[in-house]
Amino acid sequence: MAGYLRVVRSLCRASGSGSAWAPAALTAPNLQEQPRRHYADKRIKVAKPVVEMDGDEMTRIIWQFIKEKLILPHVDVQLKYFDLGLPNRDQTNDQVTIDSALATQKYSVAVKCATITPDEARVEEFKLKKMWKSPNGTIRNILGGTVFREPIICKNIPRLVPGWTKPITIGRHAHGDQYKATDFVVDRAGTFKVVFTPKDGSGPKEWEVYNFPAGGVGMGMYNTDESISGFAHSCFQYAIQKKWPLYMSTKNTILKAYDGRFKDIFQAIFEKHYKTEFDKHKIWYEHRLIDDMVAQVLKSSGGFVWACKNYDGDVQSDILAQGFGSLGLMTSVLVCPDGKTIEAEAAHGTVTRHYREHQKGRPTSTNPIASIFAWTRGLEHRGKLDGNQDLIRFAQTLEKVCVETVESGAMTKDLAGCIHGLSNVKLNEHFLNTSDFLDTIKSNLDRALGQQ
């Protein structure tokens, strides 16, 4: 942790020469207490606050630039700041993560920087009190909701699936199933049974799963009607927001009761709450078998939302990220069942390898686009909740500027590698370093806003 703090202090000292790379103080209690730089007089006024969750390593540094150079010069918004950097999570016994989630419940919109989920090596590196849980998991457990991942499409970035000309958004039901299962190894012959004992005192129900003639493995897993219903509401509301059709995939032909329950709950909620709205937007909802859906996705041009059970969503979201070209061009939004509360972030991690180079004083070429889109998706949603068309227009303009900047040929090394191959790319010929790329986006944004 000491090394982490030294780097941040050195960055703060460097800011005196006009550098845009000084991150916020690691334990700043509230962003509003931090000094403001020279912002425009005619910034877009935002009536209600946005929760800001700061993060770790290279993304933390980029996050500060985005906020100070791309967002706040144009948007007058009160940011409820929470430092989710690993040192502060450890210092507060992870209470800061809980507080940030509760603030999101209160204010309905949060933007989050990528954070470290510590393993044993990180516990040693930061001298942590304990191995703290994933902040994303903690936030999801408090807010509920569904994580939707959506690619950012740039025409000049090759796709492994060339036919995907429109985005495909995956909604993963991040609750239960294999991820909360009880699994075990059987070392001898015997009978595997599952028993359900009702709380009302009525007799238990028992199912025989398998008679093992010898060793093997077994598993028991579950989900709840409440969680499946929340998942369904989030998916239907997200599809309406995007004005895209929604597909839900299961294997209900095999898991007739388990996956059949997902299918039945989705259909009932659709008929009761959303069919009229879907018809109005000329979009539709369909259930598909997972194997049929995978085949259809590969053949499609995109432009839909795909609701997946937990394991399917885990696997298919990574396939989509690679199929569209880069995890650095993937957004992630947690949408709660109330249809009002969201938390937006980049789909990638803290870019540790680049941060190690940055600590040594070496320039990096780190892709900031997904982090920028975390801000824009959060601000756009704030604008929709508040009826603030200027804020919506700003968020959409910044997203358009990012895409057009890449399509004009200015990009970071990861994207240049998608086009030319990583071994063939050269700095300033095929790609820019991090600061130059961000400065290019800033110049293009200022120009685009000046033309409105």
From Swiss-Prot:
Catalysed conversion reaction: D-threo-isocitrate + NADP(+) = 2-oxoglutarate + CO2 + NADPH
Lineage per the UniProt record: Eukaryota, Metazoa, Chordata, Craniata, Vertebrata
Protein name from the UniProt record: Isocitrate dehydrogenase [NADP], mitochondrial
Originating organism: Bos taurus
Binding, D-threo-isocitrate: T117, S134, P135, N136, G137, T138, I139, R140, R149, R172
The organelle targeting sequence, given as a residue range: 1-39
Domain of life: Eukaryota
Critical for catalysis (site feature) positions: Y179, K251
EC id: 1.1.1.42
PROSITE patterns: IDH_IMDH
